[in-house]
């Protein structure tokens, strides 16, 4: 895709702080981090959402996260946990699927805030999902 910023980064046309790269995936530092060490895992092949992603990327990227990236973040940044997120279309400016790796630290204030009003609809949503 010609105008995709992530595709340009993958091709080396734009700079990035690359942490890891192989033939399937490129991992870069987020330029808008939620916490220190916030990384983005990008498939090298352009795709818009998780439904477009090849299974090879999914299995490979989670292996890289488990075996390489999470241990690196724990060792170098002393994070206590890791939040993985894919927020397609929810505030996402770049239409190229990616996985956010957000290192978690005590008192990092990066908590997900739930909506207690949604509890009223829990049974209705459960029913819809299990029909």
What feature does the model see in each segment?
Residues 1-131:
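HIT superfamily nucleotide-processing domains
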């Amino acid at each position: 895709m010609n105008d995709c910023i992530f595709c340009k980064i993958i091709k080396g046309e734009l700079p990035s702080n690359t942490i890891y790269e192989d033939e399937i995936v490129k991992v870069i530092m987020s330029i808008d981090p939620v916490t220190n060490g916030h990384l983005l895992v990008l498939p090298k092949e352009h795709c818009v959402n998780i439904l477009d992603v090849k299974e090879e990327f999914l299995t490979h990227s989670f292996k890289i996260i488990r075996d390489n990236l999470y241990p690196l973040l724990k060792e170098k940044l002393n994070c206590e946990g890791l939040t993985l997120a894919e927020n397609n279309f929810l505030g996402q400016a770049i239409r190229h699927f990616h996985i956010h790796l957000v290192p978690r630290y005590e008192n990092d204030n990066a908590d997900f805030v739930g909506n207690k009003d949604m509890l009223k609809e829990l049974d209705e949503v459960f029913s819809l999902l299990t029909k």
